[in-house]
């Protein structure tokens, strides 16, 4: 059963739209696509266990690596948004996909809660004040089975 099949109405439709766009975006990165589906499933399970909003967890899991396919552009985009880059910009590209996506995705998916974008932002390096949703996505990214 896919993630969106576990929801109804507008939530189901939005998750289906996200998954379809993700499929196209990651057409050349199938392992990344399968990983994102796995993170969404794992985040949904963790959300159920820990009492976190299920929809937000599933949505954040799906989009958490949205910009990972843009490694060549991430430093430029990060600088454009004023994201601070510590150390070598080339080394930072592995970590910038979360913060950059958190700036851009609200325009594409305005229906999603700001908490979803914060979880996407924080899934690479965490934060001292992580919310339960942030932690669910952070852990799901590390433990998903794919």
Model features per residue range: what roles?
Residues 2-4, 13-28:
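Generic N-terminal amphipathic, Lys/Arg-enriched alpha-helix
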Residues 2-8, 105-107:
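An acidic intrinsically disordered interaction segment
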Residues 20-26, 35, 44-146:
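Divalent metal-dependent catalytic cores for phosphoryl transfer on phosphate-bearing substrates
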């Amino acid at each position: 059963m896919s993630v969106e099949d576990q929801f109804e109405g507008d939530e189901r439709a939005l998750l289906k739209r996200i998954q379809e766009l993700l499929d196209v975006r990651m057409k050349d990165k199938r392992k990344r696509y399968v990983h994102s589906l796995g993170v969404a499933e794992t985040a949904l399970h963790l959300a159920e266990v820990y009492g976190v909003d299920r929809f937000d967890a599933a949505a954040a899991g799906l989009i958490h690596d949205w910009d990972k396919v843009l490694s060549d552009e991430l430093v430029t985009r990060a600088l454009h948004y004023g994201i601070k880059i510590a150390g070598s910009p080339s080394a930072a590209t592995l970590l910038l996909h979360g913060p950059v996506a958190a700036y851009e995705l609200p325009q594409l998916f305005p229906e999603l809660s700001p908490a979803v974008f914060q979880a996407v932002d924080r899934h690479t390096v965490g934060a001292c004040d992580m919310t339960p949703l942030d932690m669910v996505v952070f852990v799901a990214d590390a433990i998903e089975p794919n």
